[in-house]
């Protein structure tokens, strides 16, 4: 069974979705890692008995030092893939050159890279927004796009649009994980 590591910073709703829909079915979540000791997602990892690493990013003077510790933790668990699921850190080449990872981003990349992507997507002139799953690279939200899912604006208010983006991102994340792992199985044959 393929193994993944999941990185998160906040509520952990995407971690919970992965655990509910994939863990011990399609793959094994071998570790959940957060950079925030107060992150809500910690409870999901505990509930599922998943090994949990808390690496408080505020205790490091440099981003590279944090990333080195993160790489060390991930490598210990030997995942086939690392998944950034609401992990709110800009990663340096210390991470991106050593860890194979995908990221969930709440816009149709290359539009609206970085923070506040949902808000910026909602306010732009396009009729649709959406989510992207992409490979993690040293460029912020700049890695190869694996898949995208659109969300029509259709005169929705912001709360309705945001809710739909958050609903669809979980589905896209699961599809992206399975797609990458399946692609790697085919290439390995």
Predicted regions and their residues:
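Charged helix-capping and loop-helix junction motifs
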Residues: 65-71
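Short, surface-exposed acidic-centric catalytic microdomains
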Residues: 25-65
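Glycine-rich phosphate-binding loop signature in dinucleotide/nucleotide-binding domains
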Residues: 73-79
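Alpha-helical structural signal in soluble globular domains
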Residues: 17-24, 44, 48, 73, ...
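N-terminal Rossmann-like dinucleotide-binding module
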Residues: 1-40
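Donor/substrate-binding cores of folate-linked one-carbon enzymes
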Residues: 21, 81, 85-189
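Short loop/turn motifs at secondary-structure junctions
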Residues: 26-28, 78, 127
């Amino acid at each position: 069974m393929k193994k993944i590591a999941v990185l998160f910073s906040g509520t952990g709703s995407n971690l919970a979705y992965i655990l509910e829909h994939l863990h011990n079915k399609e793959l094994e979540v071998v570790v959940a890692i957060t950079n925030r000791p107060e992150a809500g997602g910690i409870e999901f990892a505990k509930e599922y008995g998943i090994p949990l690493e808390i690496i408080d990013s505020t205790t490091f003077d440099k981003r590279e030092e944090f990333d080195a510790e993160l790489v060390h933790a991930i490598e210990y668990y030997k995942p086939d893939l690392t998944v950034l699921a609401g992990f709110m850190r800009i990663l340096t080449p210390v991470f991106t050159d050593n860890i194979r990872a995908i990221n969930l981003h709440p816009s149709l990349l290359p539009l609206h890279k970085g923070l506040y992507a949902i808000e910026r997507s909602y306010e732009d002139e396009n009729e649709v927004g959406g989510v992207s799953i992409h490979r993690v690279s040293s460029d912020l939200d700049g890695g190869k796009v694996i898949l995208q899912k659109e969300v029509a604006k259709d005169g929705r208010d912001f709360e309705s649009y945001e809710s739909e983006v958050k609903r669809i991102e979980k589905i896209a994340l699961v599809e992206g994980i399975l797609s990458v792992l399946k692609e790697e199985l085919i290439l390995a044959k």
